[in-house]
Amino acid sequence: VNQHSLLIMVDHSKINLTLSQDFYDRFNEVIVVDHHRRDDDFPENAVLTFIESGASSACELVTELLQFQGAPERLSKIQASILMAGIMLDTKNFSTRVTSRTFDVASYLRSLGSDSGEIQMISATDFDEYRRINELIIAGERITDDIIVATGDNHKCYNNVVIAKAADTMLAMAGIEATFVVARTSH
């Protein structure tokens, strides 16, 4: 990293969600690409901001940027598969927050060779992660007929992916309109 280096923050716009505050502080200029609304803790040194809260996922936005940049290099099959996996994750396999733009981007990625077998491998949950997700689900309690609140073990730390997957799994259950998962993280 030098004074000409550029940090690109993707799928978040909060400085405290970067991997490391020390790492973030090493950059003078930042680009933000996100599909969440701009919030507090936004970088003051952003030289470019591409925030589209109507987009299905950050992968959709990244693909659009790459698709229309006009560079002669094309995405590889694995790169196309990774971006497609991200879109499929955020849209729950094209069932929520999908727009015509989402399908246009998916079609473009498919034309580049995104592979469903690769996507399955990328998206697979390992056994230990699956157990942690289910631990949170089992801890869930209905506070009303359509709302579930789950609380993690206070002596354990859970990562954000496990927490989100537990909440999404419960939200997909019949009759459930809202889920809340409260758990300790390493942050």
Across the structure, where does each feature detected by a protein language model lie?
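Structural motif
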Residues: 5-8, 29-31, 178
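Short glycine-rich anion-binding loops that position phosphate/pyrophosphate groups of nucleotides
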Residues: 12-15, 36-38, 154-155
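N-terminal small/polar loop signature for handling phosphorylated ligands or for N-terminal nucleophile
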Residues: 1-25
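Short alpha-helices
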Residues: 35-106
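Hydrophobic helix-and-loop "lid/oligomerization" segment in the mid-to-C-terminal part
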Residues: 1-4, 92-187
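Short helix/loop capping segments that flank catalytic or ligand/cofactor-binding pockets
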Residues: 17-19, 41, 96-97, 159
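Solvent-exposed alpha-helices and their adjacent loops that cap or buttress functional pockets
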Residues: 2, 22-25, 42-43, 75-77, ...
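Catalytic-core regions built around general acid/base machinery
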Residues: 22-27, 105-108
